[in-house]
UniProtKB/Swiss-Prot annotation:
Organism superkingdom: Eukaryota
Regions that span the bilayer: 14-33
EC number(s) given by UniProt: 2.4.1.-
Lumenal side: 34-425
Cytoplasmic side: 1-13
InterPro entries: Glyco_trans_15, Nucleotide-diphossugar_trans
Gene for this chain: KTR2
Function of the molecule: Involved in N-linked glycosylation. Transfers an alpha-D-mannosyl residue from GDP-mannose into lipid-linked oligosaccharide, forming an alpha-(1->2)-D-mannosyl-D-mannose linkage.
Protein name: Probable mannosyltransferase KTR2
Primary localisation category: Golgi
One biological process term in Gene Ontology: cell wall mannoprotein biosynthetic process
Keywords: Glycoprotein, Glycosyltransferase, Golgi apparatus, Membrane, Signal-anchor, Transferase, Transmembrane, Transmembrane helix
Length: 425
């Protein structure tokens, strides 16, 4: 009897220990379930990440074996003596920046962005222009930031300063009037010098004589995406003379008499300069509605105010050096509108390109993401943004392309843009 009691006691203890073990095991299992799920999710997302990245391996690794400049940013973790391969062949081109000494930080930000996204793979020259001598700090900092050669030039006074034939009384009155109207840069004398210089003198600088193409860069801009190609090469191979990324409406208060001067020029000029059958004149003169939500901006002249935003432009210097462009500029310049009003280089370049070039000599670089305050542009194709590692959202309010103030749809219809819009009733 005593033996039975001992046996039952041992069985009870064993059952209790077993139940306790089961409870502990169940508790541990329940605690581990979220962790196991997390491991499963981590494994899934890791696998998907590898699938996406491997899809773009060629794009991501296409520049791993580039030969890079020793004295500057290499953008490469490997020692230079381990790099192998052949440099990308460069075109006869330069990156061009009109900049002042005090804008150094903004210049470096723009340079870093463009070097990261494009020039680290080509090492194009950087050319800097200023109306006063560059200081040593500016030269040293920009030289260190560039992957290619840097060069600096002082703009001659006769190319920059206000011409002597401008009536000073009328000029001062114009400054005061525009300042009272709160027109952007309406009271600035130096801004007018800059617009006139960029319209008719930048391409005459001796430092640019050796080059065929230029890429205009301004301080404090950003390039959102890796460049999928060399735009200079695209320009040369496809016989393009002018390239842009953003097009929008101009402020009419800055150019009230510009179109009148253009019309006078058209009446007086030789017809050989202009071919209305093949040019993009409709881009700057057409007022037709495009779609239900994209109308037109009111204008008091025959100019619809569309222009290419020239803070990003890639151009053929030989077009600007041509007699037909110089004749056009000098005629406009003789009217004094750069000073009595506030004509910008953007509408001047845009009207000139639309009149004097064939529409298929102008290219819209729609794969290039770009930001100049307050507007930007971002490629609309999702997989293109992935492939080019873009840091932008095509649906962001800052993306001007589908904004009502954008002229991109006008370019699609009246330039060398979208075929379906040209034939849409």
């Amino acid at each position: 009897m005593q033996i039975c009691k001992v046996f039952l006691t041992q069985v009870k203890k064993l059952l209790f220990v077993s139940l306790l073990f089961c409870l502990i095991a169940q508790t541990c299992w329940l605690a581990l379930v979220p962790y196991q799920r997390q491991l499963s999710l981590d494994s899934y997302f890791f696998r998907r990440s590898r699938e996406v990245s491997s899809r773009y391996d060629f794009t991501r690794r296409r520049h791993m074996n580039q030969t890079l400049k020793l004295s500057s940013n290499t953008y490469n973790d490997e020692p230079l003596n381990k790099t192998k391969g052949i440099k990308n062949q460069r075109e006869n081109a330069t990156l061009l920046m009109l900049v002042r000494n005090w804008e150094l930080s903004g210049a470096l930000r723009s340079m870093r962005s463009l070097e990261d996204r494009f020039n680290k793979n080509y090492q194009y020259d950087w050319t800097f222009l200023n109306d006063v001598p560059f200081d040593q700090e500016f030269i040293e900092a920009t030289t260190a930031m560039a992957s290619g050669r840097t060069q600096y030039a002082l703009i001659p006074a006769e190319d920059w300063n206000r011409p002597s034939w401008i009536n000073e009384t009328l000029f001062e009155e114009a400054l005061q009037l525009m300042e009272e109207k709160n027109i952007l840069y309406g009271g600035s004398k130096s801004y007018r010098n800059m617009c006139r210089f960029n319209s008719g003198f930048f391409f005459r600088q001796k430092i640019l004589d050796p080059y065929d193409f230029y890429f205009r860069v301004e301080p404090d801009v950003e390039y959102f995406c890796d460049f999928p190609y060399d735009p200079f090469k695209v320009m040369r191979q496809n016989n393009k003379k002018y390239g842009f990324v953003i097009t929008m409406y101009e402020y009419e208060d800055t150019i009230p008499s510009l179109w009148e001067a253009v019309e006078e020029y058209l009446e007086e000029t030789e017809s050989a300069d202009i071919d209305m059958e093949s040019n993009a004149f409709g881009f700057v003169s057409n007022f037709d509605f495009i779609g239900k939500s994209f109308g037109v901006i009111d204008s008091n002249s025959g100019y619809n105010l569309c222009h290419f935003w020239t803070n990003f432009e890639i151009g053929d210097l030989n077009f600007f050096r041509s007699e037909k462009y110089i004749r056009f500029f000098e005629y406009l310049d003789s009217k004094g509108g750069f000073y009595y009003e506030r004509w910008g280089d953007a509408p001047v370049h845009s009207i000139a390109a639309s009149l004097l070039l064939k529409k298929d000599e102008i290219i819209h670089f729609d794969e290039l993401g770009y930001k100049h305050m307050p507007f930007g542009t971002c490629p609309s194709a999702y997989y293109l943004r992935l492939q080019q590692r873009c840091l932008c959202d095509s649906n962001h309010p800052d993306n001007i392309d589908l904004n009502v103030i954008s002229c991109l749809r006008r370019w699609w219809k009246d330039g060398s843009g979208k075929y379906f819009l040209k034939h849409d009733s």
